Every structure is written in C-alpha cells, then in structure tokens.
A protein has these predicted regions:
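Hydrophobic/small/kink-forming positions within alpha-helical transmembrane segments
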Residues: 14, 18, 62, 88-93, ...
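Loop-to-transmembrane-helix transition segments
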Residues: 6-12, 43-63
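Hydrophobic residues within alpha-helical transmembrane segments
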Residues: 12, 59, 85-89, 108-112
Length: 124
C-alpha cells in the first residue's frame, strides 16, 4: 500500500538531480572555457574532479540514485519514471533564475511538450 510519504523518494531523486546539474554548470562556468590543447583539457577536467562544489554535484547524483532505488521498492517503474520529466521543468526555471540563462518561448514550449507527452504516456 502506497503512502504519501513514499513520494518523498521520488521528490528527493528530482531535487538531488536538479541540484547536481545546476551546481556543475555554475561551477564549470566560473572556471572558464575548456582549453584547446589536449594536455590543457586533461588538466582542466582533473581540476574539476577535485573541486569541492563539483564533488557535491557528484555526491548529489549518488544520493539521487539511492533515493531512486528506494522509490523502486515502492512504485512500479511505469508509475514513477514519468515524474522524472519534472527535472526538465525545474532545470529550465532554476537555470533562468540562478544562472541567468535565457528562458525562451521555444524552451518553454519544448518542456511543455515533454511534460504533456509524459502525462499522456503515463495515463494509458
């Protein structure tokens, strides 16, 4: 029997996934562009791996994975997975607000189509 509390596992999966994406983009943008030469690229990427905020993004992905595994003990995949489309909504809105990325009509329309398609697919 499902309890409303069980949906917290799905919510945690979404929250930690969105956090991970936003913190990675924010921190990488602060560190500058990827160098053009091979040695510079490798050095840059290795430095990213040891950045504490980047590490927190990876840790968030790990926590999201654990939350998803917990959700899978409570829900059928076909019921739970459509909720993951909310990642698109939250990343779009929060990247506009926190990262000052443009929120264009095309992006909003595209995300709306994804959510609508998810609702249609999960209701059948």
């Amino acid at each position: 029997m499902l309890r409303p509390f069980d949906y917290l596992y799905i919510l945690a999966t979404i929250a930690f996934t969105v956090y991970g994406q936003l913190i990675l983009k924010w921190r990488i943008a602060q560190m500058g562009p990827l160098p053009t030469n091979a040695v510079g690229k490798v050095s840059f990427l290795i430095s990213l791996l040891f950045d504490p905020l980047i590490a927190s993004g990876f840790a968030a992905a790990l926590v999201a994975s654990f939350a998803w595994m917990a959700a899978m003990t409570k829900f059928e995949l076909s019921h739970a997975y459509p909720f993951m489309s909310m990642n698109f909504v939250f990343v779009l809105l929060l990247s506009g607000w926190l990262l000052n990325e443009p929120i264009t009509f095309q992006k909003v329309f595209g995300v709306a189509l994804i959510v609508l398609g998810t609702v249609v697919a999960s209701s059948g």
